[in-house]
Amino acid sequence: MEIFKLLRKDRKMLFLMFIGTVSFLFIFIPFLKFQMIGSSHKINAYPSLSAVCGLLLGPIYGFFAVMLVTLIYFFLNPKAFYFGIYSLIPPTLAVISAGALSEGKWKYSAIILIVGLLLFYLTDVGRVAFYYPYLSTLALLLILIFREKISKLLFSKDWKKMIVGATILSFSSVMTDHLYGSILGIVYLHLPAEDYISVIPLFIKERLIMTVIGAFFVIFAIEISKCFLKNATKLKEKLLKSYIDKEIKINCKNMLNVDEELLKKYNVKIPSEEEQKEILKTLVEVVVFNNDKDENR
């Protein structure tokens, strides 16, 4: 179950999550910086936060959160943004990619990376340092291989599967940010191919560190949400109702293709929407009860 997608349906929870994420971004962004290639500027590790931001808020609200924080920092200290206003592009695309991927909409994440790779190879630097974005290519391959399974891995009970899902989510968002940042370095700062080639060992280390940090935040957010939901009875009931309503709507659409004459012939009755809701509610409650029972053993 996509916990955060359901949580966002509650306006109060959405507001709290949005404010909490924005505050978290403000606190974390000034720390953990890396030297930028071909420049005296330093890169801070905000790409580590793209995955958890996209996970918590989704692609749309995550986009607005990152945009808000980045714009405020831009107006406070524009010199720190070495690509000018275009510095907004990498983090926003990274959080959109992470948000889409966490909801099982892997095609959007794949498209963002494919477009970035095409843009990179259209440049002179891309044709010379053609092997430079191989980690971004690896991220794309992971998305194409795992697809919607990434979302399922994230919310798996098996902690090993959760780590795999969190790592893929973090790695793909970090490499999306890196790819578009590299393109801006070519277009905006006119960095030569030699700079990109010479820095390959350094950026591998940087991005892997960011991936690990990002995966940690993702796992932490999921575990905290599970503990919270376990003890929030009213919210759990509201989310359960929302989930059931969604499932019933899908089932009702599928039932439009049922042959009514065939049902009458064999005296088969399809339960009403309310009856289906009660049945599904009972089943979900039994499953939740058994899960809680197993965890307490």
From Swiss-Prot:
It is a multi-pass membrane protein. The keyword Transmembrane helix applies. Its main location: membrane. One of its GO terms (cellular component) is plasma membrane. Keywords: Cell membrane, Membrane, Transmembrane, Transmembrane helix. Signal peptide: none annotated. It is found in: Cell membrane. The chain crosses the membrane at residues 14-34, 55-75, 81-101, 110-130, 135-155, 163-183, 208-228. This is Uncharacterized protein MJ0923. It comes from Methanocaldococcus jannaschii (strain ATCC 43067 / DSM 2661 / JAL-1 / JCM 10045 / NBRC 100440) (Methanococcus jannaschii).
